[in-house]
């Protein structure tokens, strides 16, 4: 569990082991990892996966506020002992420049179909608060770059859309390979857009060449503010769910897109739409 505002936004992450008895207090967690310094917001995002291909599940943590919001991502290997501070992480990856918010979002999945789980990090403020946004893919190839600019793949947003604010991975075309989904909730006057990048051997480097683009219903909806994936109709295939927190004066909406061979390009034609209770 992340607590990014702990101790003047230094941030903390808490691990609770599934040992038959979960503690009711964060202070009694099995492992507590502290951020590096105030303002880092360590714990702003979390993901898990086997990031060094040793058969054990590791932890990735974002700290979007690190160094004037340049941002950092940390990987902690499951090697028998977790450090007490982020500064002692096994891998540290630093964003490109101030106010990029690198580490605001993290997801994981095998994005080059080599059988190993890769790390994906979003920086919705890139470049330096202009907020076009970028998404960085780091392949699990035995050596992670320490700088975001040296990622294996970089996908760039446009038009101050805050691309990379939310990320999720899942097989959304039922071909047996994990695909990448990223949002730009501020697109087109905060209407919002969600982009699907299929794992077909070549991931594009700009949102303009995404395999599927889904656009929100109207301005100021923030479509894509949140993303998740799962089998929501029990057909054995992974579907996509998208949140739009500001729909109808912050009433909010959630949209489900079934993995049925054709994902629509507009939120209004989602397979399921769930509307919040009140403004």
Question: What spans do the regions from the language model cover?
Answer:
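Conserved beta-strand/short-helix segments
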Residues: 1-279
């Amino acid at each position: 569990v992340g607590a990014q505002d702990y101790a003047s936004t230094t941030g903390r992450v808490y691990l609770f082991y599934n040992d038959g008895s979960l503690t009711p207090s964060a202070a009694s967690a099995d492992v507590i990892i502290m951020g590096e310094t105030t303002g880092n917001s360590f714990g702003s995002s979390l993901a898990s996966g086997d990031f060094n291909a040793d058969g054990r599940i590791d932890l990735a943590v974002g700290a979007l506020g690190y160094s004037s919001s340049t941002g950092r991502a940390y990987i902690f290997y499951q090697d028998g002992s977790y450090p007490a501070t982020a500064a002692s992480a096994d891998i540290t990856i630093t964003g490109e420049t101030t106010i990029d918010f690198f580490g605001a979002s993290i997801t994981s999945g095998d994005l080059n179909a080599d059988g190993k789980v890769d790390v994906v990090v979003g920086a919705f403020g890139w470049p330096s608060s202009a907020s076009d946004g970028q998404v960085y893919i780091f392949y699990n190839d035995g050596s992670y770059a320490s700088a975001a600019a040296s990622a294996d793949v970089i996908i760039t947003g446009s038009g101050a859309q805050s691309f990379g604010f939310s990320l999720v991975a899942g097989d959304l075309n039922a071909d047996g390979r994990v695909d990448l989904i990223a949002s730009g909730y501020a697109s087109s006057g905060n209407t919002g857009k969600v982009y699907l990048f299929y794992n077909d051997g070549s991931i594009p480097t700009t949102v303009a060449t995404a395999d599927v683009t889904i656009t929100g219903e109207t301005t100021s909806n923030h479509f894509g503010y949140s993303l998740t994936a799962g089998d929501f109709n029990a057909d054995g295939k992974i579907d996509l769910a998208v949140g739009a927190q500001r729909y109808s004066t912050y009433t909010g909406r959630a949209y489900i897109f079934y993995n049925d061979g054709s994902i629509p390009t507009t939120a209004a034609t989602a397979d399921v739409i769930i509307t919040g209770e009140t403004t």
